[in-house]
Amino acid sequence: MSASTKFHHKDTLLSIDIKRMKLHKRGMCSGIFTRCGLLIWAVFLASNLFAQEPAKGPATVAELQQKLTAHVNEARFASAMWGVKIVSVDTGKTLFDHNAQKLFSPASNSKLYTVALALDRLGADYKIKTSLYAAAKPDSSGVLKGDLIVYGRGDPTINARLHGENIFAALQPLVAALTNAGVKRIAGDLVGDDSFIKGPPYGSGWAWDDAEYYYGAEISALTINDNTLKVTVKPGEKAGAACKLSLSPETSYLTLSNRTTTAEKGARRTISFYRPLNENVVYVSGQMGLEEGAYSDEVTVHNPAGLFVAWFKQALERNGVKIGGKLRTMGWLERKSEPIDCEKLVELGSVESLSMADIAREVMKPSQNLYTDLLLAEVGEKNRAAESRESRRGEETSEDLGIRELNKFLGEAGVKRGDVLFEEGSGLSRNNLTTPNATVALLQFMNRHKASTAYLNALPIAGVDGTLRSRMKGTPAANNVKAKTGTLRWANSLSGHVTTAAGEHLIFSIMLNRYHSVDGRGSGRAEIDVIPVWLAGLAAKSEQR
């Protein structure tokens, strides 16, 4: 992770890696910060930008248009590209259009599309099932002869965060499902099967050096604890001693290689983490000063299904269930030579995820990459099952099928063909492209959709929650703008809804690519935020079409 400065949110982060000078993200958008100095600096930049604007919003639409035109054409954006589309829901009138037909890197605005697809194809009440399969029921003494297969379908909600930071509380419903079936001992192996999702564990176009960071967690049908662990580093008892390391939740599935040193009091912290690809060893290096407070960050695990069954074994043993065999996993490649037919197995029990409406909030508010790509895979596999007789689709990945269904859905939503070019669902890939026109059309369609309430409620609210928690505070946009953020290095976006001071409902999409501040005025996010603030303060309504 190198010596780095980080902006943290509870569930998402932006990090500026000073050594690599690289912007990272989980969802590539950030709202809640835990590095106080940087929080003050970020707020200063944003507030300084807003402070230059008059407290009163534009009096007329014409004045708004003049301000917007002047803003996007300022000299500091000479090497950047703006795309802006603003439409009135009430009148259908376009208030502003600047490069709205051009393709941009949307970053996590991609999630607007994937979540809309999931709500449309699966429904707001849909739940994802995790099953316990065996060849037969347990005998009269509670012995299960043969293996127990934990078959996942991509439930993202089995994690400590949603269960009081207790991973065993998260697994307890699955334990109860097994014990309710009368199982007291498993004679065979405990098998973690994540073959439901077919394809590599990373989204198409993801950068390899994102894989160790929690926003780049592996995609697995047996996802557990967001497929991450928290590493905490504390200084040793004296200068020269190694720092103290710990993992949370505790596990031996991933090991820590301690290369750290406790420096003299007040020394600069240089702690970094490195997990090689396809390994479950994290090398912790660098130093921290004596008596310094604890430093924590999250790292990903390789083959999360293995971590799932490791913790599930512990949970079973805590409840008196013995396991005679070993732990192993089966993925989509292993199942090519040893296929599984769930219909021929006995389902001993199952658990279900939160509803799709709830998952949508867990995706959009913190901008959660892993969950988004799990939803895309879920839609893809449902499509495969619906067309199982068409063997030509047999070799396509879950992601391929999900993207195919997304393109079909966008046609139904009235989005122009060629305006959305996606490879994966979260926006972590720079190969994803879309236009402000397409994004506004999608938002208009979802505003009329039967799942419109679930979709709108999933969006972050300016100055209140999610990745907008710290943005636009103290402005007319606060507790008003509901929008999805997007941030990659050199790519920022914000698309959603706002109500003007005149009471008019507007939908907007703002995209800024390739902007680099050379005069210290502010970040791409701050440059974007002035626009919804102006919209919220607009005193006049647009004319009827």
Describe the predicted segments one by one.
Residues 92, 111-115, 190, 222, ...:
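Residue-level preference for non-acidic, small/hydrophobic
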Residues 35-48:
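Bacterial N-terminal signal peptides
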Residues 52-73, 120-417, 526, 533-544:
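Conserved serine DD-peptidase/penicillin-binding transpeptidase domain
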Residues 95-97, 169, 366, 376-545:
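Small-residue-rich helix-loop
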Residues 3, 10-24, 42:
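Short, low-complexity, charge-dense intrinsically disordered segments
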Residues 99-104, 298, 426-429:
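A short glycine/serine-rich beta->alpha loop
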Residues 73-98, 328-329:
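A short, well-structured edge-of-sheet supersecondary motif
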Residues 97-117:
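Short active-site loop at a secondary-structure junction
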